[in-house]
């Protein structure tokens, strides 16, 4: 299977269209969800799963705003992490901690886990600093993300 298709498949696992509380999710995406909840406790993580052109499944075109740009940067960060031997970011778990809204990737992570943890940590911090525009949730990707 094409790696790009694998990434899209993994991203769809968190899509609110088919998500339920008992549906399995790749462990890394579960950790990323928890990081988002650490930095943005007042908004459910699934609000970020289908936002703009880059948050959630795939990504193309010009980001619609700063929050969408956070997701584009996160996608690019995962693409860089994939260059590490045997590193599959959507499935790589890592050690981190959340303390009072502050995320820290722990030192015991291998190169892949450290890279993926940092991608997720930086994205969660970026999400916390970017305004959320309800009009950019669940947009028409074909019309707005060319």
UniProtKB/Swiss-Prot annotation:
Its main location: secreted. Its EC number is 3.1.1.4. Binds 1 Ca(2+) ion. This is Neutral phospholipase A2 muscarinic inhibitor. Its cofactor is Ca(2+). It catalyses: a 1,2-diacyl-sn-glycero-3-phosphocholine + H2O = a 1-acyl-sn-glycero-3-phosphocholine + a fatty acid + H(+). Expressed by the venom gland. Residues 1-21 form the signal peptide. Snake venom phospholipase A2 (PLA2) that inhibits the muscarinic acetylcholine receptors (mAChR/CHRM) with no subtype selectivity. Shows catalytic activity. PLA2 catalyzes the calcium-dependent hydrolysis of the 2-acyl groups in 3-sn-phosphoglycerides. It comes from Naja sputatrix (Malayan spitting cobra). GO terms for cellular component: extracellular region. Keywords: Calcium, Disulfide bond, G-protein coupled acetylcholine receptor impairing toxin, G-protein coupled receptor impairing toxin, Hydrolase, Lipid degradation, Lipid metabolism, Metal-binding, Secreted, Signal, Toxin.
